UniProtKB/Swiss-Prot annotation:
Glycans are attached at N35, N53, N85, N115, N170. It comes from Saccharomyces cerevisiae (strain ATCC 204508 / S288c) (Baker's yeast). Keywords: Endoplasmic reticulum, Glycoprotein, Membrane, Protein transport, Signal, Transmembrane, Transmembrane helix, Transport. This is Protein SOP4. Pfam families: SOP4. The gene is SOP4. Present with 11700 molecules/cell in log phase SD medium.
Length: 234
């Protein structure tokens, strides 16, 4: 009986420790009290990358989107390093095609405290900076801490400009000007092709079959004489 109780307690402690080694990040995008529309929600995402030391074979990565129209999002069941005072670091990148968001990079720290609890910290960590302040610098720039409870807040910097992802660097003569105007209109293009055919066809016939070309010219002259004779007789 006693051995069974010990086994149950051991199993409970193992489950509790395994649960403690998992973290959760809750965040919210604040759009100035505006609801998140379906269009915006599909074009906004949050990416998470594990950095520094990690206990798994590969660093953890994940991407999430909004949970509701209030801008809430969450990363759950995140792997954490084992041991007292051990820390686990993640970097989160908010991204949107409709808005410029701030901060554009967030350093997130999980720390296992001696009393068995898990401490969560977050810091603003903008592009162009190192993930951590360098220890080699006498007075390193400190990262600005962020509020993590009840969630990490991502704010709207301003609406993003309309982006043109494809731009023709060198516009050819076939796209602009007189040539481009003709090529972009099927009726004008058909007229030009017909005119070229009327000019080129007699030349080709004369080169390939001189007798036929001569007969065509004689027939044209005959019809012209008959036309003039008919006019003169009137």
């Amino acid at each position: 009986m006693f051995s069974q109780i010990v086994l149950l307690l051991s199993a409970f402690i193992y489950v509790a420790s395994a649960t403690a080694r998992r973290g959760t990040i809750k965040g919210r995008l604040d759009l100035a009290a505006s609801n998140i529309t379906g269009f915006v929600s599909t074009r906004t995402s949050f990416k998470l990358y594990q950095i520094g030391n990690f206990s798994t074979e590969y660093p953890y990565t994940s991407t999430t989107m909004f949970q509701d129209d209030e801008g809430n999002f969450e990363f759950a069941n995140l792997p954490l390093n084992d041991g007292v005072n051990e820390t686990t670091y993640y970097v989160m990148y908010p991204a949107s095609m409709d808005f410029n968001l701030k901060p554009n990079r967030i350093l997130i720290e999980f720390k296992n405290l001696e009393n068995g609890t898990l401490q969560l910290n977050a810091f603003k960590n903008f592009f162009g900076r190192e993930y951590f302040p360098s220890k080699d610098i006498t007075y390193p720039e400190k990262l600005q801490s962020m509020k993590v409870h009840p969630y990490i807040t991502v704010e709207l910097l301003h609406k993003a400009p309309i982006r043109s992802y494809l731009q023709a660097r060198n516009v050819s003569i076939f796209s602009t000007g007189i040539v481009g105007n003709i090529l972009n209109s099927r009726w004008k293009l058909a007229g030009v092709i017909t005119l070229i055919a009327l000019v080129v066809f007699p030349i080709i016939v004369e080169k390939l079959d001189p007798e036929t070309a001569r007969a065509i010219r004689e027939e044209a002259k005959r019809k012209q004489r008959e036309k003039y004779a008919a006019v003169a007789s009137k």
